[in-house]
Swiss-Prot record:
The modification N6-methyllysine is found at K3, K30, K316, K390. The lineage of its organism: Eukaryota, Fungi, Fungi incertae sedis, Mucoromycota, Mucoromycotina. Residues 153-156 are annotated as: G4. It is found in: Cytoplasm. The modification N6,N6,N6-trimethyllysine is found at K79. The gene is TEF-2. Residues 192-194 are annotated as: G5. This is Elongation factor 1-alpha. It comes from Mucor circinelloides f. lusitanicus.
Length: 458
């Protein structure tokens, strides 16, 4: 069997008609988890519908349709393999949802693939002031993505033109550099997702393309195809090496056992014997046991939904939205206030200082006041537009200072991504999304249980 390949998540971004579905469909079709029977079924249907040419995008549309109808499609269909990695494609659907999903999304992608349509007029539409190309790239950077691959698609429609390719590379390098990416570390690949050029195999239609190269701290890498560029992603650092952060989903009282908090390990690990602290409750105690699906675990790892038994803590002391952390390793603390970059998605009026909507951040659901609008930012370049704006409205991006109305524990996105993204809810819809830049923490003496005091002395 050999050792299992490392898993990486990629998100595919780009303007609506850039050919994201076709390109993704092609990779999944050729290297992926779609079994032969499914493909034959699709091909037969395609032929009957006169789609004899069998578009890869159609595979993806079928998968999406089945997924939307609630037929739980084996998520393996969204996977494909490279020599080094098992790759999962995190779908980037319609624009509005995409921004929301990307920020509140549970899965964090390791790399973004930006697909750009090379056709005349198409590239210009995607990159124009209203196009989504810039905005998706800026969002990816704001959310902490540092690995990017740019695929210039539909090269067949440009008659495989080297000049057109170079023109696009120059333009895209310019705007991704403005955003903050280093173009030298970004592989650019000219492809045809439809015909398959430079997808898995080197194209014979573009003999002028000598290959992509990228320079990173780890050294420089080169290759010819999109698949090779994906295979050259820097291996992700999994969050099990970070200090523990476990936002509580619920707290149960179980007869004969005691208090059992439940939640998903976001970073770090949790094990029996650990002295943990709960923020903002400021309770410290010892973990007696950890279990998942009614089985005892030696340790809970990132992604695990665990229940753990704690000593001398009542159900009244801790609640959903509290964050459990290791008292000896960067313990979580209450947040007095925090600064965040927010993007206003849909708010009917103007938002000014004093606005106090509900924030959903990890499992916490707490009203927070926009206490100060610090600066307004251009969403497409990420540059500052004005200091201390009087108000912001739909479509704007701003840096704001926020003050929770009740004790809350959040973290900077760069330290603990799952605890540093939030959605702003008001009028029963998502009004804005944000990323936390910095947190002002409260030091307060809290309740230390006997069990914790004893365990600490060991």
């Amino acid at each position: 069997m050999g050792k299992e390949k490392t898993h990486v998540n990629v998100v595919v971004i780009g303007h609506v008609d850039s050919g994201k579905s076709t390109t993704t469909g092609h990779l999944i079709y050729k290297c992926g988890g779609i079994d032969k029977r499914t493909i034959e079924k699709f091909e037969k249907e395609a032929a009957e519908l006169g789609k004899g040419s069998f578009k890869y995008a159609w595979v993806l549309d079928k998968l999406k349709a089945e997924r939307e109808r609630g037929i739980t499609i084996d998520i393996a269909l969204w996977k494909f393999e490279t020599p080094k990695y098992n790759v999962t494609v995190i779908d980037a659907p319609g624009h509005r949802d995409f921004i929301k999903n990307m920020i509140t999304g549970t899965s964090q992608a390791d790399c973004a693939i930006l697909i750009i349509a090379g056709g005349t007029g198409e590239f210009e539409a995607g990159i124009s002031k209203d196009g989504q190309t810039r905005e998706h790239a800026l969002l990816a950077f704001t959310l902490g993505f540092r690995q990017l691959i740019v695929a210039i698609n539909k090269m067949d429609t440009t008659k495989w033109s080297q000049d057109r390719y170079n023109e696009i590379v120059k333009e895209v390098s310019g705007f991704i550099k403005k955003i903050g990416f280093n173009p030298k570390s970004v592989p650019f690949v000219p492809i045809s997702g439809w015909h398959g050029d430079n997808m898995l195999d080197e194209s014979t239609n573009m003999p002028w393309f000598k290959g992509w190269n990228k320079e990173t701290k780890a050294g420089s890498k080169t290759g010819k195809t999109l698949l090779e560029a994906i295979d050259a992603i820097e291996p992700p650092v999994r969050p099990s090496d970070k200090p523990l952060r476990l936002p509580l989903q619920d707290v149960y009282k179980i007869g004969g056992i005691g208090t059992v908090p439940v939640g998903r390990v976001e970073t770090g690990t949790i094990k029996a014997g650990m002295v943990v602290n709960f923020a903002p409750a400021a309770v410290t105690t010892e973990v007696k046991s950890v279990e998942m699906h009614h089985e005892t675990l030696t340790e809970g790892l990132p992604g695990d939904n665990v229940g753990f038994n704690v000593k001398n803590v009542s159900v009244k002391d801790i609640r959903r939205g509290n964050v459990c952390s290791d008292s000896k390793n960067d313990p979580a603390k209450e947040s007095a206030s925090f600064t965040a970059q927010v993007i206003i998605l849909n708010h009917p009026g103007q938002i000014s200082a004093g606005y106090a909507p509900v924030l959903d951040c990890h499992t916490a659901h707490i009203a927070c006041k926009f206490s100060e609008l610090i600066e307004k930012i251009d969403r497409r370049s990420g540059k500052k537009m004005e200091d201390s704006p009087k108000f912001v409205k739909s479509g704007d991006s701003a840096i704001v200072k926020m003050v929770p109305s009740k004790p809350m524990c959040v973290e900077a996105y760069t330290d603990y991504p799952p605890l540093g993204r939030f959605a702003v809810r008001d009028m029963r819809q998502t009004v804005a999304v944000g990323v936390i830049k910095a947190v002002e923490k409260v030091d307060k003496a809290g309740k230390v249980t006997k069990a914790a005091a004893k365990a600490s002395k060991k």
